[in-house]
């Protein structure tokens, strides 16, 4: 299992809230047969499963604390091991949020093949999030909160991008255009991995 994981294609997908990275991940899954893993989704699924780990996570999250890195990595690894035989590769969405997380991931799971940086400007992301807020009813889609989320995102992400740029595995996609425009750039990068 360990060996298989190490040989898998692993793509970190990084992009701000409203950059459209979720949509791009869905399209990658359809076209390339990759498995899309979002740490947020994994955490939510674990909590609603009512498992012992889920109960522990629920308590941590209710206090507004960060889930321990160890736990997040264990969950990612379990999810990857479960799919390693059938998946063409893995999209790790919203991770790593800091350099240390990336280093730990490599120690425990494997090296990323590529970091796909879905890059949209702050105005575009704000506009998209406000639009989503009209229909989603998500409490975190209002202008004040969005500003804070973007600041947090930039602060956390810049060192991560710089870290992987040194290795030459960052592929930046301009996410200002339409979904299809962005996806054609994504495909250009992914097609080189065959």
From Swiss-Prot:
Family statement: Belongs to the adenylate kinase family. AK1 subfamily.
Modified residues (Phosphoserine): 38
Residues the entry annotates as binding ATP: 18-23, 132, 177
Enzyme class: transferase
Compartment list: Cytoplasm
Enzyme Commission number: 2.7.4.3, 2.7.4.4, 2.7.4.6
Keyword ATP-binding (UniProt): yes
Temperature dependence: Optimum temperature is 37 degrees Celsius for ThTP synthesis.
Name of the protein: Adenylate kinase isoenzyme 1
Gene Ontology BP annotations: ADP biosynthetic process; AMP metabolic process; ATP metabolic process; nucleoside triphosphate biosynthetic process
InterPro entries associated with the record: Adenylat/UMP-CMP_kin, Adenylat_kinase_CS, AK1, AK1/5, P-loop_NTPase
Amino acids binding AMP: 39, 44, 65-67, 94-97, 101, 138, 149
Co-factor(s): Mg(2+)
Region (NMP): 38-67
Catalytic function, reaction form: a ribonucleoside 5'-phosphate + ATP = a ribonucleoside 5'-diphosphate + ADP; AMP + ATP = 2 ADP; dAMP + ATP = dADP + ADP; dATP + AMP = dADP + ADP
């Amino acid at each position: 299992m360990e060996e298989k994981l190490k040989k898998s294609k692993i793509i970190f997908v990084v992009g701000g809230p409203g950059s459209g990275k979720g949509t791009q991940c869905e399209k990658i899954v359809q076209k390339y047969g990759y498995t899309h893993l979002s740490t947020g989704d994994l955490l939510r699924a674990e909590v609603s499963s009512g498992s012992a780990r889920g109960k522990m996570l629920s308590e941590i999250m209710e206090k507004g604390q960060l889930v321990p890195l160890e736990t997040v990595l264990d969950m990612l690894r379990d999810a990857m091991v479960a799919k390693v035989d059938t998946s063409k590769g893995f999209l790790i969405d919203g991770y790593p949020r800091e350099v240390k997380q990336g280093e730990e991931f490599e120690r425990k799971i494997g090296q990323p093949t590529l970091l796909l940086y879905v890059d949209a400007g702050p105005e575009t992301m704000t506009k998209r999030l406000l639009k989503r807020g009209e229909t989603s009813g998500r409490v975190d889609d209002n202008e004040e909160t969005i500003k804070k989320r973007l600041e947090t995102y930039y602060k956390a992400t810049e060192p991560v991008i710089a870290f992987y740029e040194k290795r030459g595995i960052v592929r930046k996609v301009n996410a200002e255009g339409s979904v299809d425009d962005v996806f054609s750039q994504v495909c250009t990068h992914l097609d080189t991995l065959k």
